[in-house]
């Protein structure tokens, strides 16, 4: 599987703001060596755009995999859910992820100190479009699970993880049919 169709930054350097970025010089050096300007005018991380992950053939798990999701599933975990969705033997159970299905911002997220107020903020430098992003909604959704299992008042009151319970029930049902 692949993670990204496109992974790019709008700039190859943080100049003239380097002094306001924690480790700004190192960030500039990193951007210089890991990005390349493409015809679209953006600076791409080509290595990660081309990277294909393949299953290991030795000592690998051959059973079914259930991935639990909910609103706080975002950033790298949303990327993971997108990459796993539709893979043989993988089922996403729970709620829509909080992270974007179409893409995310991140990869390098430097600390920036605003010069007058000294407020510290973090701003992602890269835009990542998920692999096969043309097959998912462009705006407004996270990764949709294969099996929806939302919260319930009763589960909250009794401190029951109803997503985990649903998966346990599915596994037991499958095992009893074998």
Q: Whereabouts are the PLM-identified features?
A:
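C-terminal "post-core" interaction segments
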Residues: 1-178
